[in-house]
Amino acid sequence: DLRSGIGLAAPQIGVNKRMFAIRLQDGDDILEFGIYNPKIVSHSVEQTYLAGGEGCLSVDREVEGHVPRYMRITLSGIDHNGNPVKLRLKGLKAVVCQHEYDHLDGIMFYDRIDPKEPFKEYGSSL
């Protein structure tokens, strides 16, 4: 069974590298890139969450709950040509990058769901 996704981190396919790739269409805007050795260098105080929750290609079941994420992040790293890059992302793009970034540190989205209050609201939802 093939499932569609919008991001994939190297550890999800058994590759022990700090890299991930994303292809996300948000309205008329398309974000498509791969990044090596990414680092979140700054983030907003404002948080957000996906109202419908998050899913993951590594998790074959639905996990209910809100995952707190930063509304805006600045991500630095190296592109596929070996050039340094810095991306300023907000909203859904920022959420997806944080999800993939977590995989690099062995963190799953459900690890961030508050077990005592799984549907806690963090700022405004997306």
Annotate the PLM regions:
Residues 1-126:
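Positively charged
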